[in-house]
């Protein structure tokens, strides 16, 4: 038996991908699932190829002494309370974003994790993709020089044809275009540009197509970020486009630029200004959770737990920072004004 025994909370689309990724790794195995829907333990065990106990009561599952960690894949409105319950029970936590739907929920979740001393992995999994490991390598090697501008944009038409649409579109669970989905683009921009955000401005709009009329919040937002060190960034979160899924990346530095899978650098001999070099990686080009780099992320998480360390890249501190910028951006378009990050940090 693998070392860490994991219980999954919620049994939907994301949960299936979490179970497969955890079980495919070398350090953990899913042994329990808690769901509001009745589940047959024998059928679930056969489907996932390992013994799984089922629960309808989260407290009962968390009380089990042979449970080391939980993976929260429930509706967004439940994340904060379930995360706090798991932390207080002494369980390490994997949680789908968001940590909370607003600043108050974020602070409650953050404080509970810190007070309990458990380790946490937040599913900003794009940081662990081969694409952004390659991009970060180009940045860290200095091939772009000093970055001064970046844009990372999320284009994914989420309409009635999409499985999660009935609850994604609600203000209760979806909350905003940026928090629901564009958060991955914001998280990657912050990873690539580094430094502290000083101020954000954000604008909202939405499609006239009737397919997207069900959204209870603007389905497109564009956010401009001003960093304390002078860098500028932009994130578009577009849920009402009619096109293939597209995760756009453009970074500009003093010695070169990177555009999706291409980059140019003045520091590479033999290149002229009209030539791109090409990066080799598996791109983020699908919304299917089965294609997300969960296995890499979860392996890194359980490695960190073994060492008694905080997870790198997608631990608590990084996730809180991304949420803070998102909440500033959402406040900016709602109040039609620039928002200083200091307003969020001192709230």
Predicted features and spans:
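N-terminal Rossmann-like dinucleotide-binding module
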Residues: 1-49
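Hydrophobic residues in well-ordered beta-strands that form the structural core
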Residues: 95-96, 120-122, 235, 260
């Amino acid at each position: 038996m693998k070392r860490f025994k994991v219980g999954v909370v919620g049994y939907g689309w994301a949960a299936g991908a979490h179970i497969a990724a955890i079980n495919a790794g070398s350090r953990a195995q899913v042994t329990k699932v808690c769901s509001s829907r009745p589940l047959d333990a024998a059928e679930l065990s056969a489907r996932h190829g390992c013994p799984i106990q089922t629960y309808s009561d989260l407290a009962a599952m968390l009380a089990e002494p042979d449970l080391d960690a939980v993976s929260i894949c429930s509706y967004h409105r439940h994340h904060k309370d379930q995360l706090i319950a798991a932390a207080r029970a002494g369980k390490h936590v994997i949680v789908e974003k968001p940590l909370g739907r607003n600043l108050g929920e974020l602070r409650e979740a953050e404080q509970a994790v810190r007070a309990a001393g458990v380790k946490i992995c937040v599913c900003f999994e794009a940081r662990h993709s081969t694409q952004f490991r390659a991009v970060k390598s180009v940045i860290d090697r200095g091939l772009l020089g000093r970055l001064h501008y970046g844009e990372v944009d999320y284009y994914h038409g989420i309409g009635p044809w999409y499985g999660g649409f009935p609850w994604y579109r609600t203000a209760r669970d979806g909350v905003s275009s940026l928090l629901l989905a564009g958060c991955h683009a914001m998280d990657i921009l912050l990873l690539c540009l580094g430094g502290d955000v000083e101020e954000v401005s954000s604008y909202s709009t939405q499609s006239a197509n009737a397919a997207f009329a069900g959204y209870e919040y603007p389905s497109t937002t564009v956010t401009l970020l001003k960093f304390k060190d002078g860098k500028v960034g932009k994130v578009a979160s577009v849920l009402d486009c009619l096109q293939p899924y597209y995760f756009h990346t453009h970074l500009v530095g003093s010695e070169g630029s990177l555009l999706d899978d291409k980059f140019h650098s003045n520091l590479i001999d033999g290149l002229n200004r009209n030539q791109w070099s090409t990066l080799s990686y598996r791109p983020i080009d699908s919304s299917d959770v089965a294609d997300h780099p969960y296995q890499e992320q979860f392996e890194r998480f359980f490695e960190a737990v073994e060492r008694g360390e905080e997870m790198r890249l997608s631990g608590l501190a990084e996730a809180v920072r991304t949420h803070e910028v998102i909440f500033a951006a959402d406040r900016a378009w709602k109040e039609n004004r620039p928002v200083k990050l200091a307003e969020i940090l001192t709230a």
